[in-house]
């Protein structure tokens, strides 16, 4: 008779400390086998065989694998569709319960609903927990029970509700003896899952020192004043509770509000999954985009003739990261100066950003375009040259990512600002019948 076990399925929570599902699994009645699935449905969509995010996940799994070995346990790392893998897991083990953390993206919800149904048919419990946000789903609502769609009142309630209970870490170390005692299972190589090692450098998990000057310096792209932990929050290598604890400890209120924006966009995506393909404000889907492919290519390659836009795109293409102020500028430029559908830009960011999160990325793009909930008004058209003067006055950022600018070899602007502004105002007004 096979030993009865629980399985803890890791997804966007790649850490052994302060992990809600792992904590609950280890406190349950059965020894726990950790599991990670390299989902072929997701991997097949990645065009770059050296995608740095896959390398990052693989490195992180190696660390988890080694740490579990010191506890006399292991992590099962499988490759395939979740459906295929779970059928095999149930053949190999006597699974009594499955624990995992919530995911708010529509495809993930569909996947988890299907798994819950399958496990129920096998008389196996499926238990899910909040882990990647402070407040989720219906935890912050208006008095009428409806979700907030404007950030400021949402944040006021979020901040008022925030207390030690919601950010307390889960003391997992106390329960490591409840891990399944088993010889180490082999970890598939990157080559075995169809990828190659990326040479990309990844951001540090240490961010506390960045919080002191964050509010004053965060808008200046040449100053390394942001934490760069977006990637760690996205893959769960840092706990959101730990991040909030640090913010409160250092009274970094502006940075704390950025964590709340992340919660807000996750909540919006959960309540309004249609925003994956549609504008939050439906009227904006009437916009007659130009969608000129050569203009889009110039934007992607950082060859628009606007130095701040081009520097941002070069930074993105070379590092998988772009400063947040510059993200707003390049998104506004694509949608308003070039009249290219925000979905094109969102998809390009999804392909390139190491810290890509669907909820925040869609939220940011719709904000910049004007078509999102609580978005910038459509008639607010960033002037990239004024943005550069204000936030990169010494041109340190531009010169770093755009060396030809210093040598005066930079390309001419592909569209004139005043013309583009008048054009977009007319196109948007026509679409909105204003």
Language model: regions and residue ranges:
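Charge-dense, low-complexity intrinsically disordered segments
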Residues: 47, 51-55, 299, 388, ...
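Active-site-proximal binding-pocket segments
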Residues: 4, 124, 224-399
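Alpha-helical packing segments of well-folded alpha/beta enzyme cores
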Residues: 21, 60, 64, 243, ...
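Trp/Phe/Arg-rich N-terminal binding region typifying the photolyase-homology
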Residues: 1-162, 426-431
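Glycine/tryptophan-enriched, flexible segments
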Residues: 124, 145-284, 388-434
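A broad detector of the eukaryotic-type serine/threonine protein kinase catalytic domain
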Residues: 73, 100-103, 314-317, 335, ...
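Hydrophobic alpha-helical segments, especially transmembrane helices
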Residues: 12, 113, 263, 326-328, ...
